[in-house]
């Protein structure tokens, strides 16, 4: 049976993640599909309930849901707890656990250029 993974956000039109994820699933031989689903702020609780009912393998959350999703989950991983926001929801043993890969991904890309330990930095961004 095909596993479903989705992006919940508003807006989601034009987001390239589904193209990348579906290509990666095919390359890895995984029977998964990644779909973009526009979910407004008021629809988020029902959308999380629907993902549970339909047995989604996981979700990505983008604006405006990264903080609002937290009380709708069964728990948080360390990264989401520290950052105070969720961008990934993983279904584990019937529970939805929030994670955050933004910080780890940023540091990994930065470490390819410099070692940030012990340095003061200025970070610019829009926070999405």
Residue spans for each PLM region:
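Short helix-loop-beta connector
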Residues: 115-120
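Conserved beta-strand elements of the Class I
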Residues: 6, 122-124
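Glycine-rich Rossmann-fold phosphate-binding loop(s) that bind the pyrophosphate
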Residues: 10, 126-127
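Phosphate/diphosphate ligand-binding glycine-rich loop within oxidoreductases
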Residues: 2-114
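Short acidic/polar capping segments at secondary-structure boundaries
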Residues: 102, 127-128
């Amino acid at each position: 049976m095909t596993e479903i993974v989705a992006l919940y956000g508003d807006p989601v039109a034009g987001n390239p993640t589904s193209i990348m994820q579906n290509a990666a699933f095919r390359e890895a031989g995984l029977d998964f599909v990644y779909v973009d689903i526009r979910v407004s702020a008021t629809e988020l609780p029902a959308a999380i309930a629907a993902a549970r009912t339909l047995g989604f393998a996981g979700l990505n959350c983008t604006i405006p849901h990264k903080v609002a999703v937290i009380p709708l989950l069964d728990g948080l991983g360390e990264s989401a707890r520290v950052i105070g926001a969720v961008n990934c929801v993983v279904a584990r043993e019937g529970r939805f656990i929030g994670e955050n890969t933004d910080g780890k991904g940023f540091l990994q890309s930065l470490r390819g250029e410099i070692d940030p330990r012990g340095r003061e930095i200025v970070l610019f961004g829009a926070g999405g």
